[in-house]
C-alpha cells in the first residue's frame, strides 16, 4: 500500500498573498475550505475508488512532494460480467489469429480489473511505471519543476491525474458512467461528502470537478517547439520546427489521420476513427486515413448495455479488419493541408502539435455515446479562427473538406492562426500561465488564509528512532580474547552475552553477519524483538545496531547467523518439502507462536510476512512448549530431521515502543516503522496471517509440484479461508494488502488450532494442549542463560570461574521489584527463570539462588494495579489515520497521571498466562485483539503528542558501533 503518511509534507500552507486570478470554467465549490483532512479524503478516494494518482505539494515556492500512488489491490465494485467480457476477448483474439485467454493463470479476479473510461483491463500487468503512465508523469513533473524556477508558485496541495478520464464528479457519484451507470453513489465514507483538495486532470467536463491542465502531449509540444530538451524518461513525438515545414502550396489537398483504433465506440456510427476510415475508403480523393494498430479490447459507451468489441467485417469481406497502416511522422502529416484531430477514449491530446504543423485542423465535437469532455485550452481556441469544427458523428466531414478546397485562402489563414496559437497561447509560456491561474485561483477562492498541518507521524517516528538509537549502551573497545569463541546452546542468555561481546568490539566470526536495514527495523530489532527471545526462540536476534549517518533512515546491524538456515521458499522448492505436510504445519505453528508474543508485547505487524522472511533451520529441539493464550500450554514434537523456524524482519515491520523519557517528559508510545494509513484494516491480529497464507497460495499456484496446491489448500483451510477466496488470492499479482474484508479473520491462536486440526497433529502425537498446565511451571531451554556468562567464559576459558563472576555480579544488583501483578509477570521470566534456572543447576550456588528468590515478590502477593488502566477518550475512529482528523476533534483528553506506556505491554503480555488480572474490565479483554489494543493506545498518544515538547536543543551524536568496526575488519 502506498504510504501516504510517509509521503505527505506537513509544513503549514501559508496565507495567500499573490495577485488576483481566475479560470474561465470557475472553481468548484467543493474545493472551498479544504485543509489537511480534505487532503486525506481526496487521496484516499483516488486510491480506493480510482486506483492511482500523484500527490503534489508546493511549499515556499518549491515542489516538495511529487509522489505517485497505485493501489495494487484496487477493487472496482462495478459488478462486471467477467464471463461475457472474456468471451468477447477470446473472439477478438481469434479474429487476430491468437488463442484464447488462459483464464486460470492470466486473468485477475473480476473485482480487481482496472478501469479507464470505456475500457477495462483484466490481466496482471496493472502496476504501471515508466512503461505505462510513468513517462506521462515524468513530463508533468518536469514542467512543475520548471514552474518553480520561473514563477512564484503559492503553497498548495493537489492530486494529479494523468490518465485519459477525469475522476471527481460534482454530484458525489462514481466516475466512468459507461461502466457504473449514471447516478451510482460513491461508497462510504466518501459518499458523506466534505471538502476536497483540487484534482487536476488532462481533461474535464461540466459534470466533473477536475481542473484541466496541460496534457503530457501538450508539454512535449511546449518543450520541443521552444527549443528545450525533452526530459529523460519521456517517449513523446517532437514538434518539428517551422522552418522544416512545407509551404502551403506544396501540401496535398487531403484530410489526413494516423492512429490506433481507440475510442469508446465499436462501429462507424459511434467511433470517429472508424467512421473516418470508412469515408477515406469510399472517398480517397478527400481523405487519407489509416489505422496503425487495431485495439480490440472490450469497451462500453452509454448508448448500449454491456461491453462490445469493434465489429468485424465493417469495411469489406476480405478480412475482419483492414490491414494496419504505417505510422506517419509529424513532418509527413505536415505534407497535407487538412489534419483530422479525432477523439479516442477522450479528446485528442495531440491537438497542440497538430495545430503547429501549419495545416488546418478539422476538430470534431464529442462522438455519440461519449461524455462531453473539455481540454485546458477549450476556452482559448475559437472555431473558424483557429480550427474548423466538425460534428461528432462526422456527418458533415465530407462537406467540410470540400469547403476547405473551395476556400483555400481562408483555410490558409485559419491554419496560420492555429499555428500561432499553438506556439504562443498553447506554448511554453501559455502553459505556465495556465498552471499559475489554476493554482492562484484555487488558493484565492478556496483557502486564502492557508491551513496548518498536524505533525507527521512518520517524522515523529523517525525522531523517536534517533532517540532510541543514541540511547543504546556504548562501550570502549576491549582486546578480544585469543581463544576461539566458545560453543554454547542458543538461548536468551547466550544471545544477550554475544551481544555484549559484540559491543566490546569482539568479532563473532561466522555466528553473525552485517546487514543494511532501515533505521526503524534496526530499532525494533534491538528494543522489541531482542527482549522477546526469552519468550520465544523463533525471532532473529540482533547483536548490535549503528547508524551510518544521523540524517539517513538507513542503519547497519550485526545480526545472528543461523547455521544451515534457508528461506522457507527455498526449502519448499525442494522436490520433497511440499509433501512434508506435518513439518510445514509445525513450522507455521512456530511462526504463529512468535506472532502471538510479538503482538502482545508491542502490537507488532510484520507487514510483509512471507516465505522469504521466514528462515527454516536444521537440528530442532525435541519439543517446543508455549503458552496457548488462555492460561494453558501448547507443545510441539519434532524429529531430528525436521526444520524449526525463525522469523526475520523486513522494511515493512512496525510495532509500538515506549520512547525514552528525557528532560522531565513522560514516555511516549509511538509506532516505529511504516505508518498504517488504514488502522482499522492493517492493525489487526490477522493481517500477518493473511500475508503468509496469501504468499503460500500464490507460490503453490506457480509450483510444478503436485503436492503444492493440496498443501496450500490445507493451510488456507486451517486459516479459515473460503474456497472462492483461495482461488482468487492465488491469482493475485501482488503481495497481500489490507482490505475491508480480509482473506481471513483468524489470528495466530486460531491459525494454530486450525493447523492442528487440518494436519491431525494431536492425533499423531506431534502436538498437544494442556489447558490446566500454566507455562510458568515449564522450564524451556531458550529461557536459560546469564548474559555475562559467555563473555566471562570466553575471557577465562573456565566454566566455574565464569559462573563465579556472574553470580558475584548478580548478587551486587537486587532483582527488579515490580509494584503490580502485571509488572511482575512482565519481569518473571526475564529474571527469575533465566538467573534461577542456571543457578539451580549448580548445587554450590543454591544459597545464592535462594537469596535472589527471597528478594523477588510473587505475583499473587501484589495488587492487580494496572488492571484499572483505562484508555483516554478517543474520538470515533475515522476511515484512515488519526492524522486526518480535523483539528477540532483531535484532542483525546488528558492521559491519567499515572500512565506509563510500558504498562500496556506488561498488561497484554500477561494476558492468558495465569496473571491475577481483571481480564473482563481491563484495557484488553481476554481473547481480544492485542494489535488493535496497542493501536488504540497509540492513536490516543499520537493525538496528545506535543511536538515542541520533544524538540532537542542539541542533536545527539550517533557514533559508529565497535561491533560493526570489528566485523568490517574481519
Swiss-Prot record:
<feature type="region of interest" description="Disordered">
    <location>
        <begin position="942"/>
        <end position="970"/>
    </location>
</feature>
<dbReference type="InterPro" id="IPR006598">
    <property type="entry name" value="CAP10"/>
</dbReference>
<dbReference type="Pfam" id="PF05686">
    <property type="entry name" value="Glyco_transf_90"/>
</dbReference>
<feature type="compositionally biased region" description="Basic and acidic residues">
    <location>
        <begin position="953"/>
        <end position="970"/>
    </location>
</feature>
<protein>
    <recommendedName>
        <fullName>Uncharacterized protein 027R</fullName>
    </recommendedName>
</protein>
<keyword id="KW-0418">Kinase</keyword>
<keyword id="KW-0808">Transferase</keyword>
<dbReference type="GO" id="GO:0016301">
    <property type="term" value="F:kinase activity"/>
</dbReference>
<dbReference type="InterPro" id="IPR051091">
    <property type="entry name" value="O-Glucosyltr/Glycosyltrsf_90"/>
</dbReference>
Amino acid at each position: 500500500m502506498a504510504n501516504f503518511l510517509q509521503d505527505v509534507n506537513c509544513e503549514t500552507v501559508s496565507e495567500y498573498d499573490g495577485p488576483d486570478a481566475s479560470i474561465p470554467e470557475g472553481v468548484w465549490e467543493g474545493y472551498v475550505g479544504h485543509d489537511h483532512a480534505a487532503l486525506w479524503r481526496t487521496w484516499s478516494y483516488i486510491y480506493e475508488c480510482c486506483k492511482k494518482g500523484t500527490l503534489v505539494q508546493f511549499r515556499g515556492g518549491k515542489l516538495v512532494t511529487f509522489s505517485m500512488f497505485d493501489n495494487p489491490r484496487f477493487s472496482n465494485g462495478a459488478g462486471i460480467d467477467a464471463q461475457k467480457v472474456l468471451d468477447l476477448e477470446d473472439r477478438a483474439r481469434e479474429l487476430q489469429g491468437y488463442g484464447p485467454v488462459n483464464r486460470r493463470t492470466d486473468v485477475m479476479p473480476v473485482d480487481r480489473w482496472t478501469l479507464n473510461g470505456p475500457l477495462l483491463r483484466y490481466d496482471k500487468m496493472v502496476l504501471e511505471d515508466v512503461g505505462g503512465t510513468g513517462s506521462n508523469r515524468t513530463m508533468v513533473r518536469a514542467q512543475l519543476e520548471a514552474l518553480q524556477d520561473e514563477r512564484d508558485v503559492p503553497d498548495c496541495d493537489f492530486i494529479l491525474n494523468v490518465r485519459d478520464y477525469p475522476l471527481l464528479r460534482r454530484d458525489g457519484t462514481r466516475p466512468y458512467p459507461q461502466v457504473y451507470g449514471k447516478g451510482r453513489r460513491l461508497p462510504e465514507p466518501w459518499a458523506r461528502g466534505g471538502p476536497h483538495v483540487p484534482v487536476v486532470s488532462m481533461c474535464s467536463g461540466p459534470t466533473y470537478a477536475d481542473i484541466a491542465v496541460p496534457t503530457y502531449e501538450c508539454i512535449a509540444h511546449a518543450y520541443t517547439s521552444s527549443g528545450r530538451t525533452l526530459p529523460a524518461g519521456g517517449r513523446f513525438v517532437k514538434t518539428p520546427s517551422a522552418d522544416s515545414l512545407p509551404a502551403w502550396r506544396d501540401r496535398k489537398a487531403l484530410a489526413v489521420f494516423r492512429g490506433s483504433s481507440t475510442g469508446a465506440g465499436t462501429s462507424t456510427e459511434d467511433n470517429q476513427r472508424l467512421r473516418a476510415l470508412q469515408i477515406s475508403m469510399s472517398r480517397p480523393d478527400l481523405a487519407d486515413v489509416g489505422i496503425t494498430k487495431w485495439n480490440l479490447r472490450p469497451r462500453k459507451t452509454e448508448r448500449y448495455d454491456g461491453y462490445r468489441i469493434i465489429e468485424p467485417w465493417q469495411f469489406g469481406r476480405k478480412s475482419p479488419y483492414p490491414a494496419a497502416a504505417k505510422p506517419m511522422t509529424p513532418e509527413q502529416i505536415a505534407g497535407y493541408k487538412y489534419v483530422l484531430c479525432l477523439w479516442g477514449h477522450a479528446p485528442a491530446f495531440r491537438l497542440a502539435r497538430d495545430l503547429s504543423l501549419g495545416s488546418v485542423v478539422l476538430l470534431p465535437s464529442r462522438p455519440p455515446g461519449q461524455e462531453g469532455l473539455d481540454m485546458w485550452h477549450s476556452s482559448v481556441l475559437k472555431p473558424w479562427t483557429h480550427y474548423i469544427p466538425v460534428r461528432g458523428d462526422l456527418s458533415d466531414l465530407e462537406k467540410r473538406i470540400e469547403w476547405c478546397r473551395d476556400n483555400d485562402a481562408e483555410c490558409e489563414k485559419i491554419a496560420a492562426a492555429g499555428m500561432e496559437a499553438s506556439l504562443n497561447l498553447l506554448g511554453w509560456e501559455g502553459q505556465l500561465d495556465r498552471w499559475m491561474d489554476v493554482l492562484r485561483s484555487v488558493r484565492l477562492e478556496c483557502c486564502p488564509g492557508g491551513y496548518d498541518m498536524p505533525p507527521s507521524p512518520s517524522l515523529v517516528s523517525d525522531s523517536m528512532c534517533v532517540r532510541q538509537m543514541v540511547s543504546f549502551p556504548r562501550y570502549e573497545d576491549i582486546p578480544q580474547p585469543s581463544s576461539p569463541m566458545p560453543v554454547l546452546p542458543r538461548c536468551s542468555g547466550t544471545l544477550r552475552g554475544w551481544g555484549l561481546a559484540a559491543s566490546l568490539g569482539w568479532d563473532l566470526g561466522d555466528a553473525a553477519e552485517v546487514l543494511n536495514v532501515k533505521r526503524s527495523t534496526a530499532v525494533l530489532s534491538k528494543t522489541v524483538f531482542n527482549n522477546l527471545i526469552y519468550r520465544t526462540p523463533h525471532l532473529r536476534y540482533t547483536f548490535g545496531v549503528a547508524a551510518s549517518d544521523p540524517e539517513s533512515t538507513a542503519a547497519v546491524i550485526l545480526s545472528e547467523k543461523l547455521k544451515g538456515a534457508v528461506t522457507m521458499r527455498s526449502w519448499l522448492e525442494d522436490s520433497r518439502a511440499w509433501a512434508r505436510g506435518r513439518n510445514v504445519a509445525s513450522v507455521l505453528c512456530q511462526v504463529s507462536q512468535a506472532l502471538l508474543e510479538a503482538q502482545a508485547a508491542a502490537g507488532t505487524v510484520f507487514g510483509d510476512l512471507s516465505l522469504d522472511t521466514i528462515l527454516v533451520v536444521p537440528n530442532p529441539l525435541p519439543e517446543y512448549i508455549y503458552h496457548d493464550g488462555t492460561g494453558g500450554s501448547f507443545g510441539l514434537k519434532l524429529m531430528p530431521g525436521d526444520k524449526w523456524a525463525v522469523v526475520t524482519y523486513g522494511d515493512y515491520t512496525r510495532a509500538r515502543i515506549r520512547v525514552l523519557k528525557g528532560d522531565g517528559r513522560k514516555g511516549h508510545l509511538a509506532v516505529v516503522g511504516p505508518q498504517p494509513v488504514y488502522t482499522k484494516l492493517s492493525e489487526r491480529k490477522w493481517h500477518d496471517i493473511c500475508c503468509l497464507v496469501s504468499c503460500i497460495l500464490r507460490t503453490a499456484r506457480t509450483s510444478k509440484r503436485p503436492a503444492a496446491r493440496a498443501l496450500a489448500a490445507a493451510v488456507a483451510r486451517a486459516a479459515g479461508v473460503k474456497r472462492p477466496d483461495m482461488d482468487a488470492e492465488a491469482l493475485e499479482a501482488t503481495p497481500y494488502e489490507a482490505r475491508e474484508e480480509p482473506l481471513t479473520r483468524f489470528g495466530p491462536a486460531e491459525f494454530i488450532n486450525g493447523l492442528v486440526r487440518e494436519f491431525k497433529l494431536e492425533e499423531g502425537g506431534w502436538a498437544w494442549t494442556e489447558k490446566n498446565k500454566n507455562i510458568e511451571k515449564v522450564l524451556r531451554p531458550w529461557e536459560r542463560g546469564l548474559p555475562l556468562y559467555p563473555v566471562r567464559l570466553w575471557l577465562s576459558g573456565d566454566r566455574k570461574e565464569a559462573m563465579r563472576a556472574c553470580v558475584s555480579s548478580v548478587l551486587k544488583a537486587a532483582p527488579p521489584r515490580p509494584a503490580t501483578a502485571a509488572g511482575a509477570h512482565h519481569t518473571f521470566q526475564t529474571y527469575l527463570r533465566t538467573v534461577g534456572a542456571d543457578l539451580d543447576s549448580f548445587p554450590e550456588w543454591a544459597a545464592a539462588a535462594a537469596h535472589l528468590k527471597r528478594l523477588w515478590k510473587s505475583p499473587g502477593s501484589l495488587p492487580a494495579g494496572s488492571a484499572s488502566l483505562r484508555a483516554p477518550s478517543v474520538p470515533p475512529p475515522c476511515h484512515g489515520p488519526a492524522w486526518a482528523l480535523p483539528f477540532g476533534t483531535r484532542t483525546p483528553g488528558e492521559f491519567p497521571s499515572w500512565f506509563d506506556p510500558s504498562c500496556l505491554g506488561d498488561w497484554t503480555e500477561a494476558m492468558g498466562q495465569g496473571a491475577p488480572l481483571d481480564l473482563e474490565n481491563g484495557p484488553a479483554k481476554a481473547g481480544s485483539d492485542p494489535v488493535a489494543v496497542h493501536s488504540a493506545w497509540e492513536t490516543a498518544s499520537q493525538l496528545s503528542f506535543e511536538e515542541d515538547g520533544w524538540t532537542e536543543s542539541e542533536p545527539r551524536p550517533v557514533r559508529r558501533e565497535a561491533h560493526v568496526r570489528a566485523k568490517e575488519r574481519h
